[in-house]
Design a protein with these regions (language model features):
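N-terminal basic, low-complexity leaders that serve as flexible interaction/assembly modules and, when applicable
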Residues: 1-92, 96, 327-345
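Metal- and O2-centered redox machinery and metal/ROS homeostasis
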Residues: 2-18, 50, 115, 119, ...
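Short, flexible, mixed-charge acidic loops at enzyme active sites
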Residues: 35, 87-101, 154-166
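Short, basic, glycine/proline-bearing loop/turn elements
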Residues: 37-49, 105-116, 254
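A gly/proline- and charged-residue-enriched helix-loop-helix capping module
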Residues: 93-132
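Active-site loop segments of alpha/beta catalytic cores
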Residues: 119-345
Length: 345
């Protein structure tokens, strides 16, 4: 945690700012040629994540190109599975794979009885390296996946659009699902504590698949576990950002102990700010596809996004989803410059 007044943190806490801070989800990623080169040098995605020097390097790459207002730890929400010895691997054009997914009581019982956060020491070393490079010039956002979102991958075994196994467990064996979520929550608490101890300035919780749940299930199987993590890791001066692709269920979030909500591009920033009675800062929410258009369209998108939040503070400019590999780096440069210029208070 930094003692410096960083623009991002000030806006999240809704203090006086001179312009809107901007950063980009997946800002270190496949749209940057230097990232591809470093990933190839490492020998693959997971080898890159587990190499503290190279993970630091790719974290810094977008900051060398663009005047962004935060660094984002280069990692993945599924590395927490290293605490369970679940052998996470990635394959190009497929994504994450667990060869032995958790689908039965027997599968769960085969995992270690004690979780070992030291299996994530490579993340701690990456954070230390990044903090050294930043030298307090910018804040560093650390992150985790929500227990529900992580569980969807551990149960399905890969990235899927059907979610048949986790939905089946939700209906037929909710007790087993709860035990899996308890395990992930326990590991996530230790992991977040380590990130904060090693210097991250904010924690973001990606509840990417929270929208699969509705009503009481959303509260019971997602928000309940997120709140347990927040309550167990609260650190003064380290704000918590919650992100979901959900287009509904927002009423369930009102009692969550967070500081900022990241929303997708389908929602109106100002309406969301008022819906939550200005309790939370709002992050977002330019449609990523606009970055495929000409500069005049990008500028109009920036103006429209800023105009939907007509308040002096409490907005963090971002995309509605993570940036995609087909975006040209020059378009990002133009976007960031426009946000900085057009958001001056």
């Amino acid at each position: 945690m930094s003692q410096t007044k960083h623009l991002l943190i000030e806006s999240i806490y809704q203090r006086t700012i001179d312009r809107t801070p901007v950063w980009i989800m997946r800002q270190a990623g496949r749209y940057l040629p230097e990232y591809i080169k470093t990933k190839n040098q490492a020998g693959g995605f997971m080898k890159l994540i587990r190499n503290p020097e190279l993970a630091c390097e790719v974290t810094m790459q977008p900051l060398r190109r663009y005047p962004l207002d935060s660094a984002l730890l280069f990692s993945d929400i599924l590395v927490v599975a290293d605490m369970f010895n679940m052998n996470l691997r990635f394959e190009d054009k497929i994504g994450p794979i667990f060869d032995k997914p958790l689908r039965t009581e027997s599968d769960l019982e085969k995992l270690p009885s004690e979780l070992d956060v030291s299996n994530l020491e490579y993340v701690n070393e990456t954070i230390k390296n990044i903090k050294g490079e930043l030298n307090d010039s910018l804040p560093l956002i650390g992150f985790i996946g929500s227990p529900w979102t992580v569980a969807t991958y551990l149960i399905e075994g890969n990235s899927t659009k059907q979610f048949s196994f986790v939905n089946g467990m939700l209906k037929e064996n909710p007790d087993l699902l709860s035990r899996i979520l308890d395990m992930i929550t326990k590991g996530s608490v230790d992991y977040v504590r380590e990130q904060i101890k090693n210097g991250v300035d904010a924690i973001m919780i990606f509840d990417t698949w929270g929208g699969l749940l509705s009503g009481d299930n959303y509260e019971k199987f997602s928000l309940n576990y997120i709140q347990k993590i927040i309550s167990s890791t609260y650190t003064e001066g380290v704000p918590v950002i919650y992100y979901s692709r959900s287009k509904s269920n927002f009423d369930k979030l009102k009692n969550l102990d967070i500081d900022c909500i990241g929303i997708s591009s389908e929602n109106n920033l100002g309406d969301m700010y008022n819906f939550f009675d200005k309790k939370f800062a709002i992050q977002g929410n330019l449609n990523t596809d606009i970055l495929k258009e000409d500069k005049d369209i990008i500028k109009k998108g920036v103006i429209k996004t800023l105009e939907t939040f007509p308040f002096e503070t409490g907005h963090v400019f971002n995309l509605g989803t993570g940036i995609t590999p087909d975006i040209h780096p020059d378009k990002v440069s133009y976007l960031v410059d426009q946000v900085r210029e057009l958001s001056v208070k």
